[in-house]
Amino acid sequence: MVAQKSDEVRNDITFNKNYEESCYDSWGYYNGKIEKISDYPSFSLSSPKLEFTKAETLKSITYPTGGKSEFEYELNEYGAKVSNDHTAVNECPNSISGGLRLRSVTNRDYDGSIISSKRYKYTKDYKETKSSGISKGEMQFSIEYNIQSLGLRLNLMSAGGFLSNTTSMNTPDVGYSTVIAEDVDSLGNSLGYKKFQFTNFGTDINGVSHLDDKAWGSNVTSDKVYSCLPFTCKSAERGKILSEEVFDANGNKTEETSYRYSKTNKTDINTATQQAIIMYRSPTSTVVGLLGWLTKTPRYSYLCSKMTTKELYDNGKTYQTDKYFTYNSCNLLSTETTANPNNEIEKAIRSYTYSCDKPGTEPFAGHGIKSAILEESFTANGMSDKYAYRYGTNVYGVPFVWQYLRIYNGGTDNIEYEVTKTDKFGNPIEFVTKGTPYVQIFSDDGTHVQLFVEDATLEELCDAVGERLAYYISQCEYYNATGLIYNKRDKLTNMHMRFFNYLGSDLLFEETTKEGLRYSYIYDNSNHLIDKSLLYGNNKWQTLKMYEYNYRH
């Protein structure tokens, strides 16, 4: 059997690499149009073309089973756009923008028959035609500079448009407030759909505005509003999911989930944008216009603070679950509270403490490690369960988990896991779990377990094998240490151990027990396990398990 990996097929049209040709629309997407440098450019909006915009995009994926997923695209569309001064969202007829959006994904069987499809709509509701897309604004192709006191005027033009000098700007050309994903069976019948709503420009469904802010403190006055002038960008707030509604094939809502967000308390940074424009140059003088604006560089994060899920039943009853989230100064989850508004008894709280919550905590203070969990607790129904992690460093200064403790209902600390020795990579060589000692030795690069010994200590191993073992481990010669134990395994009568060998691709291919039982693992060329065999005393392999995959050629 020869296995095949998934194959990707991309659209046949490729980008034109000729540097003398400009084949992009005003949004920066490939449109197949040829404009030579010698031609006089058009300083206006260039229309996108779907055929060329799809250049080199993913068209289909063929799986080893012979099945296929096909992707269909369409151009972005918007039904509103942001004003040039970034202070308002104005409705407009549905219009086409550059860039692609996913229209459908069709899953086919090996014979080409349709299994299922998912269709996407970007309208405000299932039966509406009005696009929920909002364009970030019109491209600016010319800017006029005017120093009235000197009677100087300068008009700059750009065929590609002028980009804004903003900070933290990653806003797409079109953002969608609502996306509908509909599941369809092989006959084209709807199986129901999900409606997703997101934060976007303007005011969201919770009444919160995510529009950008104008600059201030400028020495520039203008009779015309230019969209490319500096502004404070709030893109960090946009694109967050606000609600997810599930509808059945009859259009009845069966479940809804809503999300609320909050800003962290980090103060924005005041940022200066400055330009120097040469208005006039002669052999004897140069006139330079100096322009400046002040904006803010946002430093806050926009994190989910509440999630509410409602299950809707045919009898009109609902079951609601609320989840509340809080975060620490590093934006890591601190608490997650789950509650039923009608049943306080069901309230459950899960909380976390990290290394950044306790500055100076060793061994992290000198390593800049902020996200290591120190404590994790769960409280519900009057009961509590707490887990505590204690860390250490080995002789090479590498941090590792030293102890794992459990405290049930405020009782005594129960050490469930404790490491007594590590290798140079911080991997545990000797540890105790719930009172049982274990020894494991990794490869010389610290990536694979070569030896695993149950119910034995490293000291007991050294006593049985000899002092050479302690020397190999102290010198980080882990391969030699494993080989020494393997050669003397017959002396270790009271220990349970297993030895492991790996292929170059990190796959386990042989496992040997102390008693001499050898297990072999065979893989296909997709790295899927196809055979596990045992070598018996007559030197013959006996297949224990076989795995077959439905590959098609």
Positions of PLM-derived features:
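Outer-membrane beta-barrel "beta-signal"
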Residues: 544-553
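Non-catalytic interaction/targeting regions
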Residues: 1-483, 487-538
